[in-house]
Amino acid sequence: MGSNAVPSLWYWVVDERTTSGRGTWWAHTELNWGTDKQKEFVENQLGFNETSATDSHNFKKALLHQPAYLISGLDVVADHLVFAAFRAGAVGYDMTTDTNASTYNQALTWSTTAGLDSAGGYKALVENTAGLNGPINGLFTLLDTFAYVTPVSGMKGGSKNTEAVQTTYPVKSDQKASAKIASLINASPLNSYGDKKSHPPKVKGRQLQNIFDDWKLTKAVSLM
């Protein structure tokens, strides 16, 4: 992935279907995106623009018609994403075909104030036993900033169809067997249209070391 100093953009869509019991994802990262590329990415992911070059990464192509949103993050070491001093969260798209389900055809929000330095915060975030804090329709606002580290080994760009999913779904742990959720997590160093006035805060090396020292204490926690 990127260097310790250069932000990069990551996103992935995870599609868990009970018929296969296997997750699929799409992942992509590039460094030093300009305004035009940033705007093109946002438009395509929101389904506003179809092009032959980006069609395979488009939500419409993946049959995901709900609107998405961007969160801010900073790529600090290979194979790990750290969201520090940013707004961050995840949104799920209910893919059930049961029209009687309470979540049918709704977007589901998942956000948290947990941080790596809060007592039990990381464990609670990963296990997510509290489940979703929505369903919602329309716009929503994320809660406070939090720091979130998750392994993404194997996600070097392009599409992956057979590797095990390395992140948790926005559902209660006892509902994973029946959940049909496509979830998006998105990290961008800029705002949604590449405003050059929007910059990630500077994070000193000692602060980064503290973040990863905390993460090492919790890395034994199972992500699935």
From Swiss-Prot:
Pfam families from the UniProt entry: MgpC (PF05220)
Domain of life, per lineage: Bacteria
InterPro entries the UniProt entry points to: MgpC (IPR007885)
Family statement: Belongs to the MgpC family.
Protein name (Swiss-Prot/TrEMBL): Putative MgpC-like protein MPN_150
Organism: Mycoplasma pneumoniae (strain ATCC 29342 / M129 / Subtype 1)
Lineage: Bacteria, Bacillati, Mycoplasmatota, Mycoplasmoidales, Mycoplasmoidaceae
